[in-house]
């Protein structure tokens, strides 16, 4: 079934970027982070950034530039996912999705590319539909609350909004 599905699926299409249209086959490696997920492995506190490859060929161990920060990252131990199974992969091509271990340097919407300057439009953000106010019962746990909320915001799960200060 999967082989027939892959045969019928359309190939990757060129994508619009800040440097014009990027061809998925001829252009050097580039991709964008569309999801960041923490704690996928119950035994470890891991954080996986899911990267959709938009152009070129991805190879394990390649040095790439994160467009938002301009920092160079070495992309090691890329993983492919099938249901609950993880497998290490050495390479991937345009249209593939790989998971990268992340230590907090990647966010949803980041563009990762060998050649700096390429930047894809970010993931659209929608206005929140549900609002909640968080009040802390134990003041000694303020740092834990702040850290937890910031992790959820980095994953794109929540949007943090702060009320303006009433003290001036």
Enumerate the predicted regions with their spans:
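Structural and coupling elements of P-loop NTPases
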Residues: 1-168
């Amino acid at each position: 079934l999967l082989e027939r599905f892959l045969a019928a699926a359309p190939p990757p299409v060129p994508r619009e970027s800040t440097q014009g249209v990027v061809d998925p086959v001829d252009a050097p490696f580039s991709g964008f982070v569309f999801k960041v997920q923490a704690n996928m492995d119950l035994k470890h506190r891991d954080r996986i950034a899911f990267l959709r490859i938009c152009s070129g060929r991805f190879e394990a161990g390649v040095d790439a530039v994160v467009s938002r920060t301009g920092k160079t990252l070495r992309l090691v131990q890329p993983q492919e996912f099938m249901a609950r199974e993880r497998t290490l992969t050495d390479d991937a091509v345009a249209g593939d999705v790989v998971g990268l271990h992340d230590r907090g340097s990647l966010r949803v919407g980041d563009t990762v590319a060998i050649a700096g300057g390429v930047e894809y439009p970010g993931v659209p953000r929608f206005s929140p539909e549900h609002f909640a106010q968080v009040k802390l019962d134990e003041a000694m746990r303020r740092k834990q609350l702040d850290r937890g909320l910031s992790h959820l915001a980095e994953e794109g799960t929540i949007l943090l909004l702060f009320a303006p200060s009433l003290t001036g």
